[in-house]
Amino acid sequence: MSSDGIKEIDSDLIETNYDNVVYKFDDLNLKPNIVRGIFGYGYETPSAIQQRAILPITEGRDVLAQAQSGTGKTATFTISALQRIDENEKSTQALILAPTRELALQIKNVITSIGLYLNVTVHASIGGTSMQDDIEAFRSGVQVVVGTPGRVFDMIERRYFKTEKVKMFIMDEADEMLSSGFKEQIYNIFRLLPETTQVVLLSATMPQDVLEVTTKFMNNPVRILVKKDELTLEGIKQFYINVELEDYKFDCLCDLYDSISVTQAVIFCNTRSKVEFLTTKLKAENFTVSAIHADLPQAERDTIMKEFRSGSSRILIATDLLARGIDVQQVSLVINYDLPSNKENYIHRIGRGGRFGRKGVAINFVTERDVGMMREIEQFYSTQIEEMPADIGALFN
């Protein structure tokens, strides 16, 4: 494949050589238990890349997707891989490579969550972990392997990882991997896979290294180029309240609720213990509150989200688990009780309120220690977070 048509695109453009766009998860012909896992994970509607890439991947086509993090790309290949796995065949059927251990583990967790109701085994084969554990996992049989190139190649070469039944090879952040000195190992892995293996490649950019892979190892790929979703901060008014000290946050929250009338709000905290603390305190003040965090069983998360969507609970307190991929249409207010511990999550948290053109308000509680982080966030997103005006209530009338 030549590099024609592979180029940076305007933020509102999606460029592809594949015409089918599917706007609902229910219309993707997925196994019912995958759809259950998707909704449980927090997705309601597919993102731009999910609308376009899941179908060709589940059809077995080679796919080249240019997409950055924050577009829903991990769930795209996770859903597709789970759909293609034969649950009765215990051999490895899908191999996913990532440039770092952290990303590999993150992907494994997404697969485990979305595949919660399936009988699918997943294993992370990554450097820096026990070789023996790896060997045991391969001996006992794993259907999906997520790993870093060095360790995966090592396992294949030593014949612990048997590739005969692999039908999907997915490379996440391919540009990152190919520029980080993994090229030779990746090429060697390619050569040790069955010739019929489907190749799915995700990359934020399309340098020569990536295009070379598409030419050498991909068969007439579907190309999907999706720029990062820029609806993010548009239409969302961002404010901060200088609470000075952590201990003053709760009183500040109660004062805020006295001065505004809001249908529903999401409040973000950085830790599970803070979520639980705040939930208890607000319930004691007679607020109708739900809480959600990563340690809750999936069934419980499903119920909580259902209650919140139906409006029977007015405040949802959450950790960053919720910050990606959930569209709660009626939320007009997001409160960062804690500023996020990394800048990237800010947009996922507050983007919630303004999705699909809906206006929203985001209020950040800022202690003296948080001022630096808030300035970093402003710089990172080229945005301005203003001090909350005294007449904030007028925004909600």
Curated annotation (Swiss-Prot):
Binding site for ATP: 67-74
The entry's keywords: ATP-binding, Cytoplasm, Helicase, Hydrolase, Initiation factor, Nucleotide-binding, Protein biosynthesis, RNA-binding
Short motif DEAD box, span: 172-175
Motif Q motif, residue range(s) on this chain: 23-51
GO-annotated cellular components: cytoplasm
Helicase ATP-binding domain residues: 54-224
The reaction(s) this protein catalyses: ATP + H2O = ADP + phosphate + H(+)
Subcellular location(s) of the protein: Cytoplasm
EC numbers on record: 3.6.4.13
Entry keyword annotation includes tRNA processing: no
PROSITE patterns on file: DEAD_ATP_HELICASE, HELICASE_ATP_BIND_1, HELICASE_CTER, Q_MOTIF
Top-level division of the source organism's lineage: Eukaryota
Gene Ontology MF annotations: ATP binding; ATP hydrolysis activity; RNA binding; RNA helicase activity; translation initiation factor activity
Gene3D superfamilies: P-loop containing nucleotide triphosphate hydrolases
Primary location recorded for the protein, binned into one broad class: cytoplasm
Enzyme class: hydrolase
InterPro entries per UniProt: DEAD/DEAH_box_helicase_dom, Helicase_ATP-bd, Helicase_C-like, P-loop_NTPase, RNA-helicase_DEAD-box_CS, RNA_helicase_DEAD_Q_motif
Pfam families assigned: DEAD, Helicase_C
Transmembrane domains' residue ranges: none
Domain Helicase C-terminal: from-to ranges: 235-396
Domain notes: The Q motif is unique to and characteristic of the DEAD box family of RNA helicases and controls ATP binding and hydrolysis.
Family: Belongs to the DEAD box helicase family. eIF4A subfamily.
Its job: ATP-dependent RNA helicase which is a subunit of the eIF4F complex involved in cap recognition and is required for mRNA binding to ribosome. In the current model of translation initiation, eIF4A unwinds RNA secondary structures in the 5'-UTR of mRNAs which is necessary to allow efficient binding of the small ribosomal subunit, and subsequent scanning for the initiator codon.
Assembly: Component of the eIF4F complex, which composition varies with external and internal environmental conditions. It is composed of at least eIF4A, eIF4E and eIF4G.
The protein's name: ATP-dependent RNA helicase eIF4A
Organism: Scheffersomyces stipitis (strain ATCC 58785 / CBS 6054 / NBRC 10063 / NRRL Y-11545) (Yeast)
Gene: TIF1
